[in-house]
UniProtKB/Swiss-Prot annotation:
Belongs to the eukaryotic ribosomal protein eS8 family. InterPro entries: Ribosomal_eS8, Ribosomal_eS8_CS, Ribosomal_protein_eS8_arc, Ribosomal_Se8/biogenesis_NSA2. Part of the 30S ribosomal subunit. GO terms for molecular function: structural constituent of ribosome. Residues 1-11 have a biased composition (Polar residues). Residues 25-38 have a biased composition (Basic and acidic residues). CDD domains: Ribosomal_S8e. Residues 1-38 are annotated as: Disordered. It comes from the Archaea. PROSITE patterns: RIBOSOMAL_S8E (PS01193). This is Small ribosomal subunit protein eS8. Disulfide bonds: none annotated.
Length: 125
């Protein structure tokens, strides 16, 4: 069944809200990207207007910036240490924005949205 991002069928009181129209294609949603730690793999998604969005399916390298010096470098991602989005994402090595990942330089916080941007950026913490 399709993922819909339309209005709820329930009112705040719990009463049933009778829709005066059906679902629209513009209200369709998609499954989350759930970027994992592995060899880099991108997914192309067709978006509104025929444009394309790149989703990062898997990644093992990230652009890491040291806030103290302002220098950036590409480093390996060893694993996910903490993810406030979902505790189960740590076990499954899923990277989202705000996740703490382990790198050879130290722990890093992910600042990009890998499922939206198609790139993995982070800052050293």
């Amino acid at each position: 069944m399709a993922i819909s991002q339309g209005k709820s069928t329930r009112l705040p009181s719990g009463a049933r809200n009778v829709a005066n129209r059906g679902k629209r294609k513009a209200e369709l949603g998609r499954d989350p990207a759930e970027t994992r730690v592995d060899e880099k793999r991108l997914k192309k998604i067709r978006t509104r207007g025929g444009n394309e969005k790149l989703r990062l399916a898997t990644a093992n390298k990230m652009n890491l910036t040291d806030p103290a010096t302002g220098k950036s470098q590409v480093v390996d991602v060893l694993g996910v240490i903490e993810n406030s989005a979902n505790p189960n994402y740590v076990r499954r090595n899923i990277i989202t924005k705000g996740a703490i990942v382990e790198t050879p330089e130290g722990n890093a916080k992910v600042t990009s949205r890998p499922g939206q941007d198609g790139v993995l950026n982070g800052i050293l913490i």
